[in-house]
Amino acid sequence: MEHFHGNRWDQLRAVEADILCPPPADPFQIFPSGWTRASELSEKGWRELLDRRRSQSPPPREPSPDVRRAIRRTPPPRVNRVAPIRLPERRPLRQLNANDARRPAQDAANRINQENMRAGNIDNGQPRRRALSPTQLPGVRAIPKDFNRFFRGLLTPGEFFAKSQTRYLGPFDEMPTEDTLPAADEYIILQRMGRLPDSGKSIFRQVGNLST
């Protein structure tokens, strides 16, 4: 028991000696002559020290002939730019009179007479075989050529939709009829023709009207 208490006292004395011993000596306490601690430098001192070091740095060397030759041979950096929208090429117009030169003059005269007869039938009140072009109707303006070229590669007939004052129905795989739409309403039949590439908005064309 006494031996145990003796060892305990020795351990306590060792701990007390570690606590009361002075801190180890700082190896950087002694500075050579002309040296200064970084913590003691002011902002002005830091600025002067950096300026002094910049002035002592050697001037940049000119590149060697091999380096300059390699720089001249280096291609310019490639710039990744957004590719502009490519408009489809304009389709060549059909040569309507390509085969007229091969026909005899009698055929040309007969064709002119037939056209005159058709014009006379129209004047007499008979219905035309071909409807007027939309651009010839009152209040209709032709689409600019730039828009026409832009939409030429985008427009493709697609799904059908029915729109009224209170409803918006669709899509339908086929053109809706009175049997497929609710009764007692007037609808405008639309057909999706595609989407704009930049905004994703749908392009519709009006197919007709339907009253149920």
Swiss-Prot record:
Superkingdom: Eukaryota
Question: Positions of the region Disordered?
Answer: 47-129
Protein name as catalogued: Uncharacterized protein C05C10.5
What species was this sequence derived from? Caenorhabditis elegans
